[in-house]
From Swiss-Prot:
Protein name stated in the entry: ATP synthase subunit b 1
Main localization of the protein described in the UniProt heading: membrane
Native source organism of the sequence: Maricaulis maris (strain MCS10)
Keywords assigned by UniProt, alphabetized: ATP synthesis, Cell inner membrane, Cell membrane, CF(0), Hydrogen ion transport, Ion transport, Membrane, Transmembrane, Transmembrane helix, Transport
Protein localization: Cell inner membrane
Similarity annotation: Belongs to the ATPase B chain family.
Task of the protein: F(1)F(0) ATP synthase produces ATP from ADP in the presence of a proton or sodium gradient. F-type ATPases consist of two structural domains, F(1) containing the extramembraneous catalytic core and F(0) containing the membrane proton channel, linked together by a central stalk and a peripheral stalk. During catalysis, ATP synthesis in the catalytic domain of F(1) is coupled via a rotary mechanism of the central stalk subunits to proton translocation. Component of the F(0) channel, it forms part of the peripheral stalk, linking F(1) to F(0).
GO cellular component terms given for this protein: plasma membrane; proton-transporting ATP synthase complex
One Pfam family named in its UniProt record: ATP-synt_B
């Protein structure tokens, strides 16, 4: 029993092969099978279309939308980062300008303070030097006056001695001093 169906199938295949061999046309290009081939081709394309439409295309569409959203989010994040960087740069420039202005103001204030201290110290030193100069000039005048007084006394004594030695006349030191004083006043004028 098992051999009977096998032999029937084999016989049927052999008959079909003989029919085809007699026609001389390649079976897929045989016009008698076109209707059947078109039917199965249509069914295969419908199944392929449904599979693409229901399974594959939604996944591709979702992937493309996710990628587009991710790119848009990345662009938004980049724009935000750029805006933040620009704001930080502006804040840095502003704080740098403020620090520079504060430094200039502090330098000017310090310069004014130092100039005032220097002027004060200079005035004190000048006053001290002026006082020392006046004291020195007074000491010099005193020494000069003392020296002149001594020179006057010596000149008066010398004059009295010279007149006495040369003229043989005795002159008092007081008279000789008056003569020396007159000569000194005449020379100063």
């Amino acid at each position: 029993m098992t051999h009977a169906p096998h032999s029937e199938v084999a016989q049927h295949v052999a008959e079909a092969a003989a029919d085809h061999a007699d026609s001389g046309v390649f079976p897929p290009f045989d016009p008698t099978y076109f209707a059947s081939q078109l039917f199965w081709l249509t069914i295969a394309f419908v199944i392929l279309y449904i599979a693409l439409d229901r399974l594959i295309l939604p996944k591709i569409k979702t992937t493309i939308e996710d990628r587009r959203d991710r790119i848009a989010d990345d662009l938004d994040a980049a724009a935000q980062a750029k805006a933040d960087a620009e704001a930080a740069g502006e804040a840095y420039e502003k704080s740098l300008a403020e620090a520079r202005n504060k430094a200039h103001a502090l330098a000017a204030k310090t310069r004014q303070t130092l100039d005032a201290e220097i002027a004060k110290e200079t005035a004190a030193v000048e006053a001290e030097l002026s006082a020392k100069q006046e004291a020195s000039e007074a000491a010099i005048r005193k020494a000069k006056d003392k020296a002149f007084a001594e020179v006057r006394g010596i000149a008066a004594t010398a004059t009295a001695a010279v007149v006495s030695a040369l003229a043989g006349v005795e002159v008092s030191e007081a008279d000789a001093g008056k003569t020396v004083d007159g000569l000194i006043k005449a020379k100063e004028a």
